[in-house]
C-alpha cells in the first residue's frame, strides 16, 4: 500500500513546484509592466531637451507640457544666462520655461553701423529714424515659446538701435512685466501669436522686414508701434488690445489683417499708410478711434466692424471703394475732407441722361414720319 502512495505523493509535489514557478513568473511580469508604465525618473519625462553643451552651442531647454510647477521652478533660467548667450552670439531656444530676472538689451556691447552689412535704403531709413551711429546686435534666433518671463524686457537707448538678425518667436509666452523693444530692426520673422503682455508692449520706431504674427495675442494697458515700418505681412486676427493701441504714422507695405480684433480703449491709426490690402472686418472698437490723415492705397475692408465710440476719418484717403456703409457706427463717423473713391461714370455723349432722352425723342419722331409717309403711299 505504501508503494502505491509514493507516485501520488510525487505528483502532488510536482504540482506544488509548478505553482511556485508560475507565481514567480507572474510577479516578475507585474514588476516589468509597472516599470514600463510608471518610470521612476520624473526628469526623464519632464525634460524633453536639456541644456546644450559646447563652445558654439546655444541655450536650449525644452520642457514638456506634463511638467509640474515644481519641476518648472527647478529648471528655471536666469535672465543673466539668456543675455550671456545672446552676448556670445549663440541662439536661445526655450520652451515651457520660467525665466527669472530682466532681459536688458542695453547691456549688449555697442557696435559701429559699418560693421554689419545693411542695404542702402534700409540704412538710410534707419539713420533718419534713429539718429545714432551705434547698434546692438542679436545675431542668432531668439525663441521664448510657451514660457513665462517674470522680469522686464528692455531696450531704451535713445541713440542706438537693436538689430535682430535671426527670427524672434514669443508665441504663447506670458510676459509678467513690461516689454520695450523700441528702435529695433527685425531682419527675420517675428511671431507673437498667442502671447500675453500683462503690462506695456512698446515697439516704437520698429522695422519689421519679414511677416509679423500676432494672432490671438493679448496686449495689456498700453501698446505702441508709433512710426514703425512693416515690410512684410501683418496678421493680428482676433488679437485683443485691452488698453491704448497706438499705430500712429505706421507704414504697412504688405497685406494686413485685424479681423475680429478687439480694441478696448482709445485706438489710433492716424497718419498711417496701408499700401496693400487691409481688413478690419468684424473688429470691435470700444472707445474713440482715429483714422485721420490715414491713406488706404488698396482695398480697405470694414464690413461687420463695430465702432462703439467716436470714429474720426477726417482727411483720410480711400483710393479704392470702401465699405464703411457695412460697418456699425453708434455715432456718425467724422468724414471731414475725407477723400473717398467714386467709380468713374461712363464717358461719351450717348451715356449721359439728357442725350439718351434726346435720342429717344428723335427716334420717335423718325418713326412718326415713317408712319405718315406709309399712309400717304396708300
Features from the language model and the residues they span:
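Bacterial N-terminal signal peptides that target proteins for export
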Residues: 4-11, 17-27
Amino acid at each position: 500500500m505504501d508503494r502505491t502512495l509514493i507516485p501520488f505523493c510525487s505528483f502532488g509535489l510536482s504540482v506544488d513546484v509548478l505553482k511556485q514557478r508560475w507565481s514567480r513568473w507572474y510577479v516578475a511580469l507585474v514588476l516589468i509592466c509597472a516599470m514600463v508604465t510608471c518610470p521612476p525618473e520624473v526628469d526623464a519625462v519632464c525634460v524633453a531637451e536639456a541644456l546644450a553643451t559646447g563652445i558654439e552651442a546655444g541655450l536650449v531647454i525644452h520642457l514638456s507640457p506634463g511638467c509640474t510647477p515644481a519641476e518648472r521652478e527647478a529648471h528655471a533660467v536666469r535672465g543673466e544666462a539668456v543675455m550671456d548667450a545672446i552676448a556670445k552670439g549663440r541662439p536661445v531656444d526655450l520652451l515651457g520655461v520660467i525665466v527669472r530676472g530682466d532681459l536688458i538689451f542695453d547691456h549688449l556691447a555697442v557696435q559701429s553701423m559699418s560693421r554689419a552689412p545693411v542695404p542702402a535704403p534700409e540704412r538710410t531709413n534707419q539713420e533718419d529714424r534713429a539718429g545714432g551711429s551705434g547698434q546692438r546686435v542679436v545675431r542668432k534666433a531668439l525663441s521664448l515659446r510657451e514660457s513665462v518671463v517674470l522680469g522686464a524686457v528692455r531696450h531704451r537707448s535713445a541713440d542706438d538701435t537693436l538689430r535682430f538678425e535671426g527670427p524672434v518667436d514669443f508665441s504663447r509666452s506670458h510676459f509678467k512685466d513690461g516689454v520695450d523693444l523700441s528702435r529695433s530692426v527685425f531682419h527675420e520673422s517675428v511671431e507673437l501669436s498667442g502671447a500675453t503682455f500683462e503690462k506695456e508692449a512698446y515697439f516704437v520706431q520698429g522695422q519689421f522686414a519679414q511677416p509679423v504674427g500676432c494672432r490671438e495675442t493679448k496686449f495689456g494697458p498700453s501698446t505702441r508701434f508709433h512710426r514703425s515700418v512693416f515690410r512684410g505681412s501683418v496678421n493680428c486676427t482676433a488679437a485683443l488690445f485691452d488698453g491704448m493701441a497706438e499705430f500712429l504714422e505706421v507704414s504697412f507695405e504688405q497685406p494686413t489683417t485685424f479681423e475680429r480684433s478687439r480694441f478696448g480703449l482709445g485706438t489710433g491709426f492716424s497718419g498711417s499708410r496701408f499700401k496693400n490690402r487691409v481688413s478690419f472686418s468684424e473688429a470691435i472698437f470700444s472707445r474713440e478711434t482715429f483714422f485721420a490723415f490715414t491713406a488706404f492705397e488698396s482695398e480697405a475692408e470694414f464690413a461687420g466692424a463695430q465702432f462703439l465710440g467716436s470714429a474720426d476719418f477726417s482727411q483720410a484717403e480711400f483710393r479704392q471703394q470702401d465699405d464703411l456703409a457695412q460697418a456699425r457706427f453708434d455715432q456718425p463717423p467724422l468724414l471731414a475732407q475725407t477723400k473717398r473713391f467714386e467709380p468713374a461714370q461712363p464717358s461719351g455723349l450717348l451715356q449721359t441722361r439728357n442725350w439718351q432722352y434726346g435720342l429717344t425723342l428723335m427716334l420717335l419722331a423718325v418713326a412718326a414720319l415713317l408712319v405718315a409717309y406709309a399712309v400717304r403711299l396708300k
